[in-house]
UniProtKB/Swiss-Prot annotation:
Superkingdom, taxonomy of origin: Eukaryota
Sequence motif: Nuclear localization signal, positions: 224-231
Annotated keywords: Activator, DNA-binding, Nucleus, Transcription, Transcription regulation
Protein name, as recorded: Transcription factor LG2
Region of interest (Leucine-zipper), ranges: 248-262
Residue ranges of the region described as Basic motif: 222-242
Compositionally biased spans, kind Polar residues: 116-154
Disruption phenotype: Defects in the formation of the blade-sheath boundary in leaves (e.g. absent or incorrectly positioned ligule and auricles) and delayed flowering.
Gene Ontology biological process terms, A to Z: DNA-templated transcription; positive regulation of leaf development
GO molecular function, one term: sequence-specific DNA binding
Lineage start: Eukaryota, Viridiplantae, Streptophyta, Embryophyta, Tracheophyta
Location of this chain's protein in the cell: Nucleus
Gene assigned in the entry: LG2
Coiled coil: none
Length: 531
């Protein structure tokens, strides 16, 4: 056992560099000269150096020293003892330096702050200089020397190097040497991690309550919360900005659609009373035109859904939802027209909000219900006898209501014409009863709104009656046929408005067709010249 320890100690000393050995030797001789030992048991080295120097080695050194003295003519035993003490203290200095991973003579650029280095050197000097003078302390130190071995000092060196170089707390590395070393050794020789207990605990608390940024700076918990709040606020701001941009884009598209509808209305030459529609149009009428343009866009989308549902052979439940949406869509149109009738009924009766081809088939500001039923019956085949009977009864009742409304409107027109033509027309506004005539005419015009409301209610009820009579798929084909019919009328109006307008009068080169038309026109004038 003594020979193994001696061989390990000699291997450790052989591994030391020359300058380190000299440095430790000088320190050891200075300490020995300052306090010469009085007996053999008084010069026990520190506990840290006891791992590499034992009683067996001292005895062997004394024996060899005594033999050499007798053989060589006398060597002073005190010199041998002082040399052994110097070697033991140099081993203690080496162990203290090995704990830090770098010897003191080479610590030019330390890898940790200077205050940690000073604490480490002060701790090592205290451990080296604190040697007991009584026998009990010598025995305790001797027992600690026997417990420590080079194999147990290696984990200490690894733990010390990891803690000081990384400057962080590693629970896994610190637990290994603490478990391996006995309690007595831990009491006299605290682990290197405990030397940095003040600073290491602070760093551990900072890491517990904060985090480290990418640039290596430590951020406390309060700053981290503020940074998180700033990131969340920036994310919400980006979402609001995105929604605002989408709203602006939607408004821009809507404005383009309104401008397109107004341009289309002007190109169709809508005139009321010999003036432009834009000049005499009220605010309610302009708002209705914009809402009707939006309604047409939605109607096109719903027609596409109906067509897709019929082609995909959807179930009656899914197809019925689309049909109900179409019915609600028409209800919305009737509500818009009723709101405008209370403010500007003439705008609805003249049909200036519709295309020219649609106005040709208008009856009191809209479609004639009986005529619409005649168009829809061939599109709804096959129909059962009960369905056909219900549609015929609906058509007959619609015709009777239309006739009654037409007669009432005709009587209103006749009464209004008689009221306006009352009195003398040659005097103009200077007539004595002019204001009375205008007041009576205004009262009769107020009843014109009632006629229009009754006609619109008839159209609305006809659509709801058709929905009750027909099945789900028949109702889908019904709404699809109505939408396609008026879509073709609008397309016809656009084609008529975009047709080429040729001037047949005053042209130098006339086509044969134009020449024939002019010749026919002259013949007709000569034929009816006598009339």
């Amino acid at each position: 056992m003594v020979q193994g320890e001696e061989s390990s100690w000699r291997m450790e000393r052989a591994a030391l560099p020359l300058n380190q050995a000299l440095a430790y030797g000088v320190q050891a001789h200075a300490a020995a000269a300052a306090a010469p030992p009085t007996c053999f048991l008084d010069f026990q080295p520190a506990a840290a150096s006891a791992a590499y120097f034992g009683f067996g080695e001292l005895e062997e050194a004394l024996i060899h020293g005594g033999g050499a003295a007798s053989a060589g003519g006398g060597v002073d035993p005190g010199v041998i003892i002082k040399n052994d003490v110097a070697q033991a203290k140099s081993a203690a200095g080496y162990l203290a330096g090995a704990g830090t991973g770098r010897p003191p003579t080479l610590e030019i650029f330390p890898s940790w702050p200077m205050r940690h280095q000073q604490q480490l050197h002060s701790g090592n000097s205290q451990s080296v200089g604190s040697t007991g003078t009584d026998s009990s302390s010598a025995q305790n130190t001797m027992s600690q020397m026997e417990l420590v071995s080079p194999a147990s000092s290696a984990p200490r060196q690894e733990v010390m190097m990891v803690t000081t170089d990384d400057y962080s707390y590693k629970p896994g590395l610190a637990a290994a040497p603490a478990a391996a070393a006995p309690p007595s050794f831990q009491q006299h020789h605290p682990l290197p991690l405990q030397l940095h207990g003040g600073e290491g605990g602070g760093d551990h608390d900072k890491r517990k309550h904060g985090s480290t940024r990418k640039d290596g700076k430590l951020v406390d918990a309060k700053t981290e919360r503020r940074l998180a709040q700033n990131r969340e606020a920036a994310r919400k701001s980006r979402l609001r900005k995105k929604a605002y941009v989408q709203q602006l884009e939607t408004s821009r598209i809507r404005l383009q659609q309104v401008e397109h509808e107004l341009q289309r209305a002007r190109s169709q030459g809508l005139f009321v009373g010999g003036c432009s529609a834009a000049g005499d149009m009220s605010s309610g009428a302009a708002m209705f035109d914009m809402e009707y343009a939006r309604w047409l866009d939605d109607d096109t989308k719903r027609l596409a859904e109906l067509r897709g549902g019929l082609q995909a052979h959807l179930l009656d439940g899914n197809l019925g939802l689309i049909v109900e949406e179409c019915m609600q869509h028409y209800d919305e149109l009737f509500q818009l027209k009723a709101a405008l009738a209370r403010s500007d009924v003439f705008h609805l009766l003249t049909g200036s909000w519709a295309t020219p081809a649609e106005r040709c088939f208008f009856w009191m500001g809209g479609f004639r219900p009986s005529e619409l039923l005649k168009i829809l019956i061939p599109q709804l085949d096959p129909l059962t006898e009960q369905q056909l009977l219900g549609i015929c009864n609906l058509q007959q009742s619609s015709e009777q209501a239309e006739e009654a409304l037409a007669q009432g409107l005709h009587q209103l027109h006749q009464s209004l014409a008689d009221t306006v033509a009352a009195g003398t027309l040659n005097d103009g506004a200077a007539a004595p009863n002019y204001m009375n005539i205008m007041a009576v005419a205004l009262e009769k015009l107020a009843s014109l709104e009632n006629f229009y409301q009754q006609a619109d209610n008839l159209r609305h009820q006809t659509l709801h009656q058709m929905r009750r009579i027909l099945t789900t798929r028949q109702a889908a084909r019904c709404f699809l046929s109505i939408g396609e019919y008026y879509s073709r009328l609008r397309a016809l109006s656009n084609l008529w408005a975009s047709r080429p307008r040729d001037n047949f009068i005053g042209t130098e080169s006339l086509s044969p067709t134009a020449t024939e038309l002019q010749a026919l026109h002259h013949q007709q004038q000569n034929q009816f010249a006598g009339f």
